[in-house]
A protein has these predicted regions:
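Eukaryotic intrinsically disordered, low-complexity regulatory linkers and tails enriched in Ser/Thr/Pro
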Residues: 1-118
Length: 118
């Protein structure tokens, strides 16, 4: 799965990077960041910025949930792709394939796109 930064400028493979969150106050305003790390960026690269720690945690949960769905779909589809191709209309198969490909990419949502129940 590919992980895209909030601003769309960074694209990393999820399986080869570790992600972490940090939060605190800057000029009396709470902020939270999500960073990715690997050998080529040991100090971390900022992927997203949120106005609260709760929103950053929610964004990380969204990422993990999407990754889990993809893994389940991969397990279900393995060995059945040929059967699906034969039993579905070409347009149906194309739409399913497009949805799967879109699931393979996670872009961190903007701050105002995350709702947190407190």
């Amino acid at each position: 799965m590919r992980v895209i930064s909030q601003d769309g400028t960074i694209d990393v493979p999820y399986d080869y990077f570790s992600l972490s969150m940090s939060s605190g106050k800057y000029k009396d305003v709470e902020v939270a960041y999500i960073y990715c790390y690997n050998l080529s960026s040991p100090n971390g690269t900022k992927l997203a910025e949120y106005s609260t720690e709760a929103k950053a945690i929610k964004a990380m949960e969204m990422l993990r949930e999407q990754y889990a769905r993809i893994e389940i779909i991969k397990a279900l589809v393995s060995g059945t792709c040929k059967h699906m191709e034969e039993s579905l209309e070409p347009e149906e198969f194309k739409n399913i394939l497009k949805k799967y490909i879109n699931m393979e990419v996670f872009r961190f949502p903007q701050d105002d796109e995350i709702e947190v129940v407190e």
